[in-house]
Amino acid sequence: MTSHGAVKIAIFAVIALHSIFECLSKPQILQRTDHSTDSDWDPQMCPETCNPSKNISCSSECLCVTLGGGDETGTCFNMSGVDWLGHAQASDGHNDG
């Protein structure tokens, strides 16, 4: 092996070890423990729009969702079928899990 090849391998090893160290030193994101599928959660669109930068909000049963930041119009979604802990509720309002 030439010295040029050895230098390439050494640089790669240093970068790989540095990457591993950086990944292990950062706090890990907690993963959901329930195994619900996306079909359990079906938000419904509300017939209105919103714009937080202009203080235009959704009605009380809907939540404003914008994609991006700045002066952007968002879409209102009804989230009444979700208990906000990650479990979908049955149509009668009782938790099915």
From Swiss-Prot:
Record localization: Secreted
Keyword field contains Signal: yes
GO MF, one example: C-X-C chemokine binding
One annotated Gene Ontology cellular component of this protein: extracellular region
Signal peptide: 1-25
General function of this protein: Salivary chemokine-binding protein which binds to host chemokines CXCL1, CXCL2, CXCL3, CXCL4, CXCL5, CXCL6, CXCL7, CXCL10 and CXCL11.
Protein's name in the database: Evasin P1142
